[in-house]
């Protein structure tokens, strides 16, 4: 079976050449097949979030190569990777736009993952019904609050919404960075 994700000698150093230099990831190689479920364990500051950031494209590694489904994505911008990679952040505030409504956040996630561009206000009835059904499945009553700003949600509600946003269109890879932190 071909690798879904392959990292080859990936390294990332922050503030290189300064007194604050920090090697967050050093010469890491791994291969994951489709369907693999992997847990990365390490103490605070061990580089787990840095690893996820490099895979998701939040920043580029200093060295090495990242391949997703055989495609070299090492220097592919984050917005292009987000069509294939779903992500939940350690901080639930990072996964949503708090001043936008639940529906607007879902629309952004849906359009991004589907690779479509559309003015934000243009969400058809079909999409609204789809969003409502998916929200109802969470059992949190958010389907009745689709016009409410996300900033009014609790941390747990926002994290559940972020998970839904990351999986509205099934990603090839789902990264969960301390997703229960909320």
Predicted regions and their residues:
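Short, conserved post-Walker A segment of ABC-type ATPase nucleotide-binding domains
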Residues: 38, 49-58, 165
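Conserved ABC transporter NBD signature motif
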Residues: 64-72
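Q-loop/switch helix immediately C-terminal to the Walker
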Residues: 99-115
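The feature captures the beta-strand-to-loop junction immediately N-terminal to the Walker
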Residues: 41-43
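Walker B catalytic motif
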Residues: 178-179
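ABC ATPase NBD coupling module
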Residues: 18, 60, 72-86, 94, ...
